[in-house]
Amino acid sequence: SNYLTCGDCMNPPWKFNVRRGTTLGGLVAVGAEYEYADYGSSKLEDMDGYELGDQPSVESFLKGVHTFRVGMEARLAPQFSVRAGYNYTSAAFTEDAYSALPLYRTSTDFNNIKDKNTLTFGLGYRGNVVYADLAYKYDVYQSDFYAFDDIDLPATKVDNSRNQLVFTLGARF
């Protein structure tokens, strides 16, 4: 088997998930969810199941990721709802992670993303045929950016924030 033909050779980690939600008075829905994914236990294998050479990097630099989500939606009127949510995801890489670039890769940079926080707010309309949704999403996280593959190169500290406004319009047939 040609190991270079392996499209996605990373076997994903095991995950643990628990969630709970309820409705209050038929007008408000609330929910919370926790998920743990052990990315450090992922396996890099070729098509025949043999471990690839980068496996020690997976075990050394990837770690367990905690994700916590909480949200609510309230019906303001029979056709209108408002919602809000929060999402926290811990970093997947260890602090000392760096990119040991393979020979077949042409990019030189590596961005070690830290814990990520996301806030969302939305307003929705649901008619008999037409529905519409307007949502705002704000992501904020820090990262260590490495311009080149050099373990002694100090990271550039980057503060990242992203604002998104998303509008969806649809019709039911």
Residue positions per predicted region:
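Outer-membrane beta-barrel porins/channels
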Residues: 1-173
